[in-house]
């Protein structure tokens, strides 16, 4: 009877393995081409009321990872950073999109060196090939300057803030589930260029959840002469990059509402 029960359990687990393998192949085969990555909070960004007045010119020089954290890994040393090293792109995108693109005019400062080199190349070319024109070489338009600078960065990444799971094993057959929660913290501050005063400062936090479930069997049959071993499972991990972007967008939204409360600006219609 026990042997029959073991065979039934083994068959069930092997059937589950086949299902997992088929689903894995489906994920690979149906991955599809590259696609645009949409905002985690498009409705929240769009729901911000428009600015009462002209767009605010703002500069972002960088938004760096100040945590120094590495990706969590079991039993090995991992030199990969836990969070993105290019989060300023999400800051710029959030500033451009918030309030249906009615709030900020972002000027290029992250690639300032490249911009200056290109402008210098244009000047040199015009000096050579347009010097005979009646009015001389065509001058370049002046670059926009910003009244505000957005500073800040990723200041915290805490691993295993919450860890848990459950499992059971009977006669060499077991199943288990596990979960883990990490958090990422983002800080932003708005600085006045004319005075150097920090006008606003906000901090936002986003959780990053991971979940794993699986089953396994380890059993000897026929008086210990035959070994049956099998394992199956799957895991779901929330993308860290997506969580960082969500925290950044929440910070931009909070800056706008705090600025309105401190009467730095007004919403349209007020």
What residue spans do the PLM features occupy?
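C-terminal motif of bacterial Sec signal peptides marking the signal peptidase cleavage site
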Residues: 13-16
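C-terminal/domain-edge helix-coil "capping" segments
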Residues: 18-54, 158, 166, 178-270
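N-terminal segment of the mature soluble domain
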Residues: 56-57, 61-160, 183-187, 191-200
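Bacterial N-terminal signal peptides that target proteins for export
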Residues: 1-6
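Charged, amphipathic alpha-helical segments
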Residues: 156-172
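Short, intrinsically disordered/low-complexity patches at protein termini
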Residues: 129-131, 173, 222-225
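Extracellular loop and loop/strand-boundary signature of outer-membrane beta-barrel proteins
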Residues: 137, 172-176
